[in-house]
């Protein structure tokens, strides 16, 4: 229906989607920065350094570091430095993981997320870094579409020439 576009609802949905994407990659970056950490340095779930975990941690972090850097360059640089592919296996430790964790936690408020949303992960002890996560509560992420919403009521599945724009 022409003229039925709700700009504020679209912005709210875009913000919610962005927050969900950020949550996914921050959780994965934290998980693999921890799994990269060898048992000998205080980590309990990892058997030792693994190039696979290193690559996964770096890749997941890189997925959101551009966005994080736009908001807090220092935090992004800390994560980049700690998970960089140029780091030697013997440079990974619980301390490196805790630096990643602290840097990411410091930007939760400006990312619109909080500690409860990120969680602790299935293998990361709550106080593994000597302190628990604390951040102000973020607004809840909307649960989904409103009752009665029909995505096909206003848009066809396929567009004809000139029908691509909203």
Question: What is the meaning of each model-derived region?
Answer:
Residues 1-166:
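Mature extracytoplasmic or organellar-lumen-exposed domains after removal of signal/transit peptides
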């Amino acid at each position: 229906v022409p003229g039925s576009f709700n700009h504020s609802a679209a912005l709210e949905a875009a913000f919610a989607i962005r927050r969900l994407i950020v949550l996914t990659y921050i959780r994965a970056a934290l998980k693999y920065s921890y799994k990269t950490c060898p048992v000998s340095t205080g980590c309990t779930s990892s058997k030792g350094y693994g190039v696979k975990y290193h690559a996964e941690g770096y890749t997941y972090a890189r997925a959101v570091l551009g966005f994080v850097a736009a908001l807090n360059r220092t935090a992004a640089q800390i994560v980049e430095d700690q998970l960089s592919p140029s780091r030697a296996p013997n440079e990974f430790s619980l301390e490196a993981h805790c630096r990643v964790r602290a840097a990411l936690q410091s930007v939760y408020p400006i990312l619109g997320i909080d500690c409860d949303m990120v969680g602790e992960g299935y293998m990361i002890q709550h106080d593994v870094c000597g302190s628990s996560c604390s951040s102000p509560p973020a607004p809840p992420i909307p649960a989904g579409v409103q009752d009665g919403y029909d995505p096909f009521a206003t848009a066809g599945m396929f567009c004809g020439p000139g029908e691509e724009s909203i």
